[in-house]
Amino acid sequence: MIFTKVDALVKDIDVDKYHIETVILSSDDLNKKIIRVKSDHGNEFGIRLDKGQKLQNGSAFFIDDHHVLAIGVESQDLIVISPKDMDEMGITAHILGNTHKPIEVKDAKIYLEVDPVVEQVLTQKEIAYTIEEVVLDKPLRHVNLTAHEH
């Protein structure tokens, strides 16, 4: 079976009415438009998303009237920065922008993959951060407001 569109989000489904099969993906896999997956029941499915469709943690595909395939995302260690004020947010954004690392900004925190160079720069600039195990709802992404290139 090949799915071409996300039918719903698990949070919007009455899970008591369905048998749920789960696939756990890496956050990087959420960026893929074409992927082959194997559920926790051993069933294989293809996902070839139509234009405009995106995977996220909790994406759901209806297999039939009684079965749903749910997408989960594995946790990963990430650098988590909670800037103490707008000045630190600006400095941090400038530093991270220069590294061209994919990030996620959510709930006044900045998330990015663990990187020893970034850790060293944050430490040198005395910007507090932690390493936390996080499950991302969406993949980290590059902020590209323009076609900026070096």
From Swiss-Prot:
Q: Which InterPro entries match?
A: UreE, UreE_C_dom, UreE_N, UreE_N_sf
- The answer to keyword Phosphoprotein applying to this record is no
Q: Which gene encodes it?
A: ureE
What is stated as this protein's family in its record? Belongs to the UreE family.
An example Gene Ontology cellular component term from the record? cytoplasm
Where, per UniProt, does this protein localize?
A: Cytoplasm
Q: Does the keyword Chaperone apply?
A: yes
Q: Which UniProt keywords apply?
A: Chaperone, Cytoplasm, Nickel, Nickel insertion
Principal localization reads: cytoplasm
One GO biological process from the UniProt record?
protein folding
- Superkingdom classification of source: Bacteria
Pfam families according to UniProt: UreE_C, UreE_N
The UniProt entry, under NCBIfam families, shows: PRK13261.2-5 (NF009759)
This molecule's function is given as:
Involved in urease metallocenter assembly. Binds nickel. Probably functions as a nickel donor during metallocenter assembly.
Please identify the protein, giving its name as recorded.
Urease accessory protein UreE
**CDD domains, A to Z:** UreE (cd00571)
Q: Which organism is it from?
A: Streptococcus thermophilus (strain ATCC BAA-250 / LMG 18311)
Q: Name one GO molecular function term.
A: unfolded protein binding
